[in-house]
């Protein structure tokens, strides 16, 4: 059982259980895209949170949903233009690589692109993932896309538009495989 923890600030936190056989990619931004407060304050099967989170959300008018389904990304996320350079493109590339056939990732009719703010928080991979898969995405630089800063082919207008995952300032990576 794996739980994904997000700290919100002001001593508030939330956690969501990662579904069995699913993976999460989240580069430097708040990632949980849906949160069930009823479960968090009830059975706690898939959601946990600080005891005063509901009041914190209400008192600060943070629930921006129209349908009553809390989206923590909307409520607590950064909403910064820099996310579209540094964070969402990296999540897009990892999801695109690990689930290449689940969605349309490229072109004008793409379901998700490098600037999408609604990328899935977790996905079930199309095949079993290996440590080599994780190593590949964590050392990637958008290879095979128009955004590859090292590519010597194709349209150069978008070359290097987004921060790569694998850069010379990355000093540490940990990969744990549990059986």
Question: Model-found features: residue ranges?
Answer:
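C-terminus-biased signal that marks the final domain/tail of proteins
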Residues: 2-5, 9-179
């Amino acid at each position: 059982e794996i739980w994904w923890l997000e700290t919100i600030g002001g001593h508030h936190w939330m956690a969501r259980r990662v579904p069995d056989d699913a993976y999460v990619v989240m580069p430097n931004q708040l990632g949980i895209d849906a949160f069930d407060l009823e479960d968090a304050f009830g059975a706690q099967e898939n959601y946990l949170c600080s005891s005063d989170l509901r009041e914190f959300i209400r008192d600060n008018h943070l629930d921006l949903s129209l349908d009553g389904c809390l989206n923590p990304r909307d409520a607590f996320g950064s909403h910064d233009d820099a996310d579209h350079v540094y964070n969402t493109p990296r999540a897009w590339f990892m999801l695109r690589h690990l689930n290449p056939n689940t969605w349309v990732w490229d072109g004008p009719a793409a379901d998700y692109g490098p600037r999408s703010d609604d990328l899935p928080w977790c996905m079930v991979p199309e095949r079993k993932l290996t440590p080599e898969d994780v190593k590949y995405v964590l050392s990637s630089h958008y290879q095979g896309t128009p955004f590859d800063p090292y590519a010597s082919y194709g349209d150069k207008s978008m070359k290097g538009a987004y921060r790569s995952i694998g850069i010379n300032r990355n000093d540490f990576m940990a990969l744990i495989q549990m059986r």
